[in-house]
Amino acid sequence: MPTLDDTDRAILHALQQNAKESYSTIAQSLEVSEGTIRFRIRKMLNAGIFDFIVHTDPKKIGLDVQAIIGINTRLGQQQHVALQLQTFEAVRFVGAFSGNHDLMIQAYFSTNDDLVSFINVDLAALEGILDVDVNVELMQYKDSFSY
């Protein structure tokens, strides 16, 4: 993986503020050539350092229920369960953690009934799950992709 210098970090910061910013505007603000910006962005894209994605607001597309679900698995079944969880459209994030749960997932649903069905039907059918701990978001204070 290439090492990022101050210019690379400044480019990333500019894109995080406005991913549609023109290369010429970024170049002017950083006092470098537009070619430098184009080259650096292409290099970082090819290295997988970042990607351009569409970020949607779940609530504005009808996904009003967000749940963070802790999952405990049978010994030796963590990866098997994680791979199955990845296949569900509602599941946005799957990660293995230390602490009280083997896996944590973030999932979005249109209604509470959809969440209940996911737990009682979909998760209940998965081999290797011992128990789940469901936490429903009541209020969101921050959701950012910037680092």
Language-model-detected regions and their locations in the chain:
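A compositional/biophysical signature of low hydrophobicity enriched in polar/charged and small residues
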Residues: M1-Y147
